[in-house]
């Protein structure tokens, strides 16, 4: 295997509750699927390259607090990915791509931060492809492309519902109907729409979106659109082009989302207090 001509794919996503109708492994299953598809597409488009598919890593942060959700601290996820990326780089691999099915802001930034760290320190290309893509998807950027691939285009009301589909709803239920139909509860068809709104009260049903709208056809259409985007980023990267605009999300520079923000904030406060105490002692000494 020529490591200069090998793309490594890391599927990384947590185990998390997605409502009463879906399995705990929704994000993890999605990550495995997209990593496999990305690897397959890479060797098709670039027969001069090999693809190495790393075992799935069922770890993530900032999860909904539901039975079965398993999270770690942001620093743990960050350190783990930095460690794996560094090890792969030391073994000579130059191209590493993370695929994730989890779209929480802190998770995205932790993965991106780890990739930036390894890329700069080891002079390789390591990218989280899914983060920026997830944000664009949630903003509704791909709705028209998906609609055009369906046997019956989406109506305006359906497009509006899709823009509010965040967790365990239309898209994720559709993906499980495609990937793991035996793990989808029949009751999804009778679940009411649940819109995520700030300040809303009441019992959380475990999902935000419209699971009753789900279909395997919708999943297939969305997969085609997303894989095209993933393939484009990988192709650019393997061709030596800068893909940071495609792989660094708009939320990357938000300090409060950084994986070790609280630790650094506390250290900063302690250093400030220590400095003030020293200045006070110096002042007291000088005025004597």
Predicted features and spans:
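Extended, histidine- and acidic-residue-enriched regions that form the cofactor-binding/catalytic faces
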Residues: 1-97, 101-288
């Amino acid at each position: 295997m020529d490591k200069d001509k090998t793309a490594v794919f890391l599927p990384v996503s947590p185990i998390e509750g997605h409502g009463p109708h879906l399995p705990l492994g929704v994000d993890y299953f999605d990550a495995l699927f997209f990593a496999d598809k990305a690897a397959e597409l890479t060797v098709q488009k670039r027969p001069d390259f090999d693809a190495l598919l790393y075992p799935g890593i069922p770890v993530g942060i900032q999860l909904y607090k539901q039975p079965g959700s398993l999270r770690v601290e942001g620093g743990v996820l960050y350190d783990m990915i930095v460690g794996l990326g560094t090890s792969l780089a030391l073994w000579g691999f130059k191209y590493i791509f993370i695929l994730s099915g989890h779209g929480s802001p802190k998770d995205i930034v932790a993965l991106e931060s780890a990739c930036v760290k390894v890329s700069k320190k080891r002079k390789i290309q390591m990218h989280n492809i899914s983060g920026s893509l997830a944000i664009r998807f949630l903003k509704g950027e791909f709705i028209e492309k998906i609609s055009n691939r369906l046997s019956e285009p989406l109506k305006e009301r359906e497009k509006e519902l899709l823009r509010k589909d965040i967790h365990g709803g239309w898209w994720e239920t559709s993906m499980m109907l495609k990937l793991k139909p035996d793990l989808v509860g029949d009751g999804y068809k009778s679940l009411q729409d649940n819109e995520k709104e700030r300040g809303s009260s009441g019992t959380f049903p475990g999902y935000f979106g419209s699971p009753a709208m789900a279909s395997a056809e919708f999943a297939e259409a969305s997969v085609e659109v997303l894989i095209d985007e993933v393939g484009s980023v990988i192709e650019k990267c393997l061709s030596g082009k800068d893909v940071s605009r495609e792989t660094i999300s708009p939320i990357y520079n938000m300090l409060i989302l950084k994986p070790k923000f609280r630790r650094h904030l506390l250290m900063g406060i302690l250093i400030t207090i220590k400095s003030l105490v020293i200045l006070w002692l110096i002042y007291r000494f000088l005025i004597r």
